[in-house]
């Protein structure tokens, strides 16, 4: 039976549960449940702290896990990303008190508070910078005000929390994070149950990022229209009652699809319809 780790709480939890449910897997009905057995799919789900998931997967005790890229890298566990899931996106950056033009080199000799010590140490080592890394389990922004640290390294979203504490982010991003599906590094690729879950989830992720576009198109502009909507492999063309027209169906990315519809309308296409895709096996 396949054993899969899922975040038990936090920003990744609901999105992970939703994507697995859409992929046809059983979801827990009580937030206190630590395990859920799905006998019809031969899968057992374990609900764990997001920070611990990479450790369990890397040890080989669990086959797959959903966690954040930043958490997986910071764990130091021997895991590999099998699939990017497209939710929980964030950036991980250095920040320090505003009022100075900070560079990463300015961190030399300073105290840096973070909840991701390994990620920070690896970055500093790669840059040849020596600094003291202080591990905190949260609310690292207040550490400078309390005199525990001189700078921080943390997940940055809108930047509102940094501004509230008069901090400014600087330097390159240490990690562009999002939810990821991980497995133990070097896992065999011939596990049918594992591959089935991966492909199901891949289909949901693809469906969330694309939609189906249908429109009627005069044959005189068909070549130009197909350049706008090339589809995944090739668009589907169907004859209409009027032999001078054809119906076109093609997948397009959700991002920017309104612009695509505008282009088709300007070109002369009619009855342009966008519809969501629930799931697919597209790749």
From Swiss-Prot:
GO BP annotations, alphabetical order: L-histidine biosynthetic process
Broad class of the protein's primary localization: cytoplasm
Coiled coil: none
Name of this chain's protein: ATP phosphoribosyltransferase
Catalytic activity reported: 1-(5-phospho-beta-D-ribosyl)-ATP + diphosphate = 5-phospho-alpha-D-ribose 1-diphosphate + ATP
Organism name: Rhodococcus jostii (strain RHA1)
Similarity remark: Belongs to the ATP phosphoribosyltransferase family. Long subfamily.
Record-linked Pfam families: HisG, HisG_C
Role, per record: Catalyzes the condensation of ATP and 5-phosphoribose 1-diphosphate to form N'-(5'-phosphoribosyl)-ATP (PR-ATP). Has a crucial role in the pathway because the rate of histidine biosynthesis seems to be controlled primarily by regulation of HisG enzymatic activity.
Gene3D superfamilies: 3.30.70.120, Periplasmic binding protein-like II
A single MF term (Gene Ontology): magnesium ion binding
Cofactor(s) needed by this chain: Mg(2+)
Domain of life from the UniProt record: Bacteria
Keywords for the protein's UniProt record, in alphabetical order: Amino-acid biosynthesis, ATP-binding, Cytoplasm, Glycosyltransferase, Histidine biosynthesis, Magnesium, Metal-binding, Nucleotide-binding, Transferase
Entry keyword tRNA-binding: no
UniProt-listed HAMAP family: HisG_Long
Subcellular localization, as worded in the UniProt entry: Cytoplasm
GO-annotated cellular components: cytoplasm
EC code: 2.4.2.17
């Amino acid at each position: 039976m396949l054993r899969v780790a899922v975040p038990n709480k936090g920003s990744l939890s609901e999105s992970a549960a939703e994507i697995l449910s859409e992929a046809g897997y059983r979801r827990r009905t009580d937030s206190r449940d630590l395990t859920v057995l799905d006998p019809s799919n031969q899968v057992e789900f374990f609900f764990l702290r997001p920070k611990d998931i990479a450790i369990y997967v890397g040890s080989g005790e669990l086959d797959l896990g959903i966690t954040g890229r930043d958490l997986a890298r910071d764990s130091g566990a021997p895991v590999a990303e099998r699939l990017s899931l497209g939710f929980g996106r964030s950036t991980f950056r250095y920040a320090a008190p505003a009022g100075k033009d900070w560079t990463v080199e300015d961190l030399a000799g300073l105290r840096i508070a973070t909840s991701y010590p390994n990620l920070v140490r690896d970055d500093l080592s790669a840059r040849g910078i020596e600094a003291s890394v202080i591990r905190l389990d949260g609310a690292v922004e207040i550490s400078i005000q309390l005199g525990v640290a001189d700078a921080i390294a943390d997940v940055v979203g809108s930047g509102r929390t940094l501004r509230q504490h008069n901090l400014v982010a600087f330097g390159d991003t240490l990690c562009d994070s999002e939810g990821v599906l991980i497995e133990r590094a070097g896992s065999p690729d011939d596990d049918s149950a594992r591959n089935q879950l991966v492909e199901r989830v891949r289909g949901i992720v693809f469906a969330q990022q694309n939609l189906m576009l249908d429109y009627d198109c005069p044959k005189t502009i068909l070549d130009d229209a197909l350049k706008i909507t090339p589809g995944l492999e090739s668009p589907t063309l169907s004859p209409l009652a009027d032999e001078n027209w054809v119906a076109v169906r093609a997948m397009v990315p959700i991002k920017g699809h309104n612009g695509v519809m505008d282009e088709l309308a300007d070109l002369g296409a009619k009855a342009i319809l966008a519809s969501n895709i629930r799931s697919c096996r597209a790749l």
